[in-house]
UniProtKB/Swiss-Prot annotation:
Region Fusion peptide, annotated ranges: 113-138
Subcellular locations according to the entry: Virion membrane; Host cell membrane
Gene symbol of the encoding locus: F
Protein's name in the database: Fusion glycoprotein F0
Region (HRA): 139-215
Subunit structure: Homotrimer of disulfide-linked F1-F2.
Organism: Measles virus (strain Ichinose-B95a) (MeV)
Family note: Belongs to the paramyxoviruses fusion glycoprotein family.
Disulfide bonds: 334-343, 358-366, 390-395, 397-420
Record note on what altering residue 137 to H does: Hyperfusogenic
Length: 550
């Protein structure tokens, strides 16, 4: 009974093993051809951004300092106009060519808002990015009544960060970089300092703030419509107090670092006021959505030797797995962190079936190419083991001082603590751990993939040869087509005449051939009869040598 139970248990274990999915990356087989994984992370995508307005007030409230700072304020206003007027003119030129599109309802005959349209004829030349930014600019613009209310509110406040709620609008933040200095230092010291000294201090502070604003909005002077401002540059102009601004915006969470590193928070200028000297920006701060089940893997390759030739396996730098599916991964729009991978857009795209077979462990499906020039990786540390191409670089056991040789029938050398605890490879000393990879991988036990060329000259040469062969094949096909067309051009009557002529020739030629054969046979019979003598000579008493000569 116990034997039956054990047999059943073994059978079930084998069955479960056979049903285990094999769609993930086969790191064991890939390591045999020098491909290892150096990290995996979750996959997060930025979703639709939330927009909120931010007002930067460039002119501080100096009601109590008017008598001492008139000259400095006049000079500061002149500098601000040189910065703000070009931006204002560009914004006006774009927004004047964008008007709302209104549709008329068929039932009630009244207009309703349908969207915006860009007057391209009046605008002239504009790039696609400028047109898209212009539409977004129109959609985020404040109306004239809101601008007037905002101007009145800013003229009465003297707080560095003031939250102002507009009717029908989102929360607006008014930020002024010099107001704290005026409130906390200049006004309390009015009785101790002279009027000239107060004016000089305020002038220096305003000049410094002007320099910061100029560095912040420098790209906007060249392209105020589509140039975007990162939150890092905005934090510099706000005195580095980015936490207070983000707190007022209502943004928090563990993904803040990922958004900042991926430059996900953007700000675009939507309004410039040259009367009260303030700028309105539309800030877009996205939220992150983690795609469940998707894991992003980073791959690295090590070159290996086959005889005197050095090869490496051609695999993508990043791939993604989701269940059985393996996909390519475009890392151009992504930021990689220990917490995960953050991308501004979807980075997954399909992978060829042959490359999927390669990553699943079929080494014969992995293409390889010759190493040209200096190749980056001839050794790599993975899971505490050193995978090195000791046929191309010097590998030395630092513990014993001996050279680690790589046999010609091995393509790579796997060094662990049981072989050498401390290894010196290419001048770098590395302490390795316990063995995680096999001691050696022999060439005759691996099915290598097809060799390919990635060099531009070689690819061009191969492509030229392929084109030449295609042209030759095309000429042969054209000649065969001509023969077929000539055969098709013959009429059925002509074909019948040709067959009749062939038959008549055969009827005449066959009897003549038979007669010729009979005549030759008769002549041969006559010649044989003439060559036979009637009497044989008497050879009695003749020597043997004479007989042999006969």
């Amino acid at each position: 009974m116990g034997l039956k139970v054990n047999v059943s248990a073994i059978f079930m274990a084998v069955l479960l093993t056979l049903q285990t999915p094999t769609g993930q990356i086969h790191w064991g087989n890939l390591s045999k051809i020098g491909v290892v994984g150096i990290g995996s992370a979750s996959y997060k995508v930025m979703t639709r951004s939330s927009h909120q307005s931010l007002v930067i007030k460039l002119m501080p409230n100096i009601t109590l300092l008017n008598n001492c700072t008139r000259v400095e304020i006049a000079e500061y206003r002149r500098l601000l106009r040189t910065v703000l007027e070009p931006i204002r003119d560009a914004l006006n030129a774009m927004t004047q060519n964008i008007r709302p599109v209104q549709s008329v309802a068929s039932s009630r005959r009244h207009k309703r808002f349908a969207g915006v349209v860009l007057a391209g004829a009046a605008l002239g030349v504009a790039t696609a990015a400028q047109i898209t930014a212009g539409i977004a600019l129109h959609q985020s613009m404040l109306n004239s009544q809101a601008i007037d209310n905002l101007r009145a509110s800013l003229e009465t406040t003297n707080q560095a960060i003031e939250a102002i709620r507009q009717a029908g609008q989102e929360m607006i933040l008014a930020v002024q970089g010099v107001q704290d200095y005026i409130n906390n230092e200049l006004i309390p010291s009015m009785n101790q300092l002279s009027c000239d000294l107060i004016g000089q201090k305020l002038g220096l502070k305003l000049l410094r703030y002007y320099t910061e604003i100029l560095s912040l909005f420098g790209p906007s002077l060249r392209d105020p419509i589509s140039a975007e401002i990162s939150i890092q540059a905005l934090s510099y102009a706000l005195g580095g107090d980015i936490n207070k601004v983000l707190e007022k915006l209502g943004y928090s969470g563990g993904d803040l670092l990922g958004i900042l590193e991926s430059r996900g928070i953007k700000a675009r200028i939507t309004h410039v006021d040259t009367e009260s000297y303030f700028i309105v920006l539309s800030i877009a701060y996205p939220t992150l959505s983690e795609i469940k089940g998707v894991i992003v893997h980073r791959l690295e390759g090590v070159s290996y030797n086959i005889g005197s030739q050095e090869w490496y396996t051609t695999v993508p730098k990043y791939v993604a797995t989701q269940g059985y599916l393996i996909s390519n991964f475009d890392e151009s729009s992504c930021t990689f962190m220990p917490e995960g991978t953050v991308c501004s857009q979807n980075a997954l795209y399909p992978m060829s079936p042959l490359l999927q077979e390669c990553l699943r462990g079929s080494t014969k499906s992995c293409a390889r190419t010759l190493v040209s020039g200096s190749f980056g990786n001839r050794f790599i540390l993975s899971q505490g083991n050193l995978i090195a191409n000791c046929a191309s670089i010097l590998c030395k056991c630092y513990t014993t001082g001996t050279i680690i040789n790589q046999d010609p029938d091995k393509i790579l050398t796997y060094i662990a603590a049981d072989h050498c605890p401390v290894v010196e490879v290419n001048g770098v000393t590395i302490q390795v751990g316990s063995r995680r990879y096999p001691d050696a991988v022999y060439l005759h036990r691996i099915d290598l993939g097809p060799p390919i060329s990635l060099e531009r000259l070689d690819v061009g040469t191969n492509l030229g040869n392929a084109i030449a062969k295609l042209e030759d094949a095309k000429e042969l096909l054209e000649s065969s087509d001509q023969i077929l067309r000539s055969m098709k051009g013959l009429s059925s009557t002509s074909i019948v005449y040709i067959l009749i002529a062939v038959c008549l020739g055969g009827l005449i030629g066959i009897p003549a051939l038979i007669c010729c054969c009979r005549g030759r046979c008769n002549k041969k019979g006559e010649q044989v009869g003439m060559s036979r003598p009637g009497l044989k000579p008497d050879l009695t008493g003749t020597s043997k040598s004479y007989v042999r000569s006969l």
